[in-house]
Swiss-Prot record:
Main location: cytoplasm
Stated role: The RuvA-RuvB-RuvC complex processes Holliday junction (HJ) DNA during genetic recombination and DNA repair, while the RuvA-RuvB complex plays an important role in the rescue of blocked DNA replication forks via replication fork reversal (RFR). RuvA specifically binds to HJ cruciform DNA, conferring on it an open structure. The RuvB hexamer acts as an ATP-dependent pump, pulling dsDNA into and through the RuvAB complex. RuvB forms 2 homohexamers on either side of HJ DNA bound by 1 or 2 RuvA tetramers; 4 subunits per hexamer contact DNA at a time.
GO annotation (BP), single: DNA repair
Binding site for DNA: R314, R319
Pfam families associated with the record: AAA_lid_4 (PF17864), RuvB_C (PF05491), RuvB_N (PF05496)
Family: Belongs to the RuvB family.
Keywords annotated in UniProt: ATP-binding, Cytoplasm, DNA damage, DNA recombination, DNA repair, DNA-binding, Hydrolase, Nucleotide-binding
Cited PANTHER family: HOLLIDAY JUNCTION BRANCH MIGRATION COMPLEX SUBUNIT RUVB, PTHR42848
Assigned GO CC terms: cytoplasm; Holliday junction resolvase complex
Record note on quaternary structure: Homohexamer. Forms an RuvA(8)-RuvB(12)-Holliday junction (HJ) complex. HJ DNA is sandwiched between 2 RuvA tetramers; dsDNA enters through RuvA and exits via RuvB. An RuvB hexamer assembles on each DNA strand where it exits the tetramer. Each RuvB hexamer is contacted by two RuvA subunits (via domain III) on 2 adjacent RuvB subunits; this complex drives branch migration. In the full resolvosome a probable DNA-RuvA(4)-RuvB(12)-RuvC(2) complex forms which resolves the HJ.
Source organism (scientific name): Photobacterium profundum (strain SS9)
Record's protein name: Holliday junction branch migration complex subunit RuvB
EC number(s) stated in the UniProt entry for this protein: 3.6.4.-
Region of interest called Head domain (RuvB-H), as start-end residue ranges on this chain: 259-337
Length: 337
């Protein structure tokens, strides 16, 4: 099973869905819902950079997938009135790949590197002087005849995005002047996002319908927008085209997304811990084998939301299903763990 197979995964279902997602993304901070602390700070930092007519300081954005790191990077570029170049850590295989991007930037432009924790060490070393001194050190030739030349770069803003801030090396992390963590969204903020997206798509939707999707979206805008598109399909084919609470509930139940936003993989993981390992603790290797899933997928995709919502604990001895997990499935809570 791969993440893209899940309706509530954080990858895009299709190229069309990705195009729609980009179309409904907010373009400016005024349209950016939720993350109030991030929005407030970025407004100040951007205005200060504009007053000084400087490039914004380098920005690191981290947090779980689907919370809007790419959206925020594009908003920063729009607010600064500059262009943005987008790439990702795995794509930058050689130092020359990075050099080609840096030398084509205009003054104060934004270079956005997604999955920046996956940069190769050699490429990362080239990035250090570029970030710190706006200079590019290039080696010409090989062996004893090799020599280093320096190329001046225009001032620019590097925006790095990662779901694994702890995987960044200290030298790279320390070169970011601004660090922002994106948190899971509140239900009210997600409801506003769903309503805004529905308006962008020209859909008829009642507030209760938006609330139903927000409650099942796992605190994640990307999932909320995906649920909206699938509920729209259901409303147009089975209903009268209007997304009300009842229509949203029936559509989401049909899609096997329950009231807590769990799908069959979430339930499979929790029930495996409860039924096969007596509630835990269970090690990651055993859990992965029990549910037939990759360890990285469990750690990066399945567990974060379950832990954040209090259904799962990650301890030194292994994973433990909490009392809340037992209650979710209508099971008796064991007397002793």
């Amino acid at each position: 099973m791969i993440e893209a197979d899940r309706l509530i995964s954080n990858s895009f279902e299709s190229r069309d869905d990705e195009v729609i997602d980009r179309a409904i993304r907010p373009k400016l901070l005024n349209d950016y819902q939720g993350q109030d602390h991030v929005r407030g700070q970025m407004e100040i930092f951007i205005k200060a950079a504009q007053l000084r007519e400087e490039a914004l300081d380098h920005l690191l954005i981290f947090g779980p997938p689907g919370l809007g790191k790419t959206t925020l990077a594009n908003i920063v570029a729009n607010e600064m009135g500059v262009s943005i170049r987008t790439t990702s850590g795995p794509v930058l295989e050689k130092a020359g790949d990075l050099a080609a991007l840096l030398t084509n930037l205009e003054p104060n432009d934004v270079l956005f590197i997604d999955e920046i924790h996956r940069l190769s060490p050699h490429v990362e070393e080239v990035l250090y002087p570029a970030m710190e001194d706006y200079q590019l050190d290039i080696m010409i030739g090989e062996g004893p005849a090799a020599r280093s030349i320096k190329i001046d770069l225009p001032p620019f803003t590097l925006i790095g995005a990662t779901t694994r801030a702890g995987s960044l090396t200290s030298p790279l992390r320390d070169r970011f002047g601004i660090t922002q963590r994106l948190e899971y969204y509140k239900v009210d903020d997600l409801k506003d996002i769903v309503q805004r997206s529905a308006n962008c798509l020209g859909l008829s939707m009642e507030e209760e319908g938006a609330l139903e999707m927000a409650q099942r979206a796992r605190g994640t805008p990307r999932i909320a927008n995906r649920l909206l598109r699938r509920v729209r399909d259901y409303a147009e084919v089975v209903g009268n085209g209007i997304i009300c609470s009842d229509t949203a509930k029936k559509a989401l139940d049909m899609l096997d997304v329950d009231s807590s936003g769990f799908d069959y993989m979430d339930r499979k993981l929790l029930l495996a811990i409860i039924d096969k390992f007596m509630g835990g603790p269970v090690g990651l290797d055993n859990l992965a084998a029990a549910i037939g899933e990759e360890k990285d997928t469990i750690e990066d995709v399945l567990e974060p939301y379950l832990i954040q919502q209090g259904f799962l604990q990650r301890t030194p001895r292994g994973r433990i299903a909490t009392h809340r997990a037992y209650l979710h499935f209508g099971l008796d809570i064991p007397e002793a763990r």
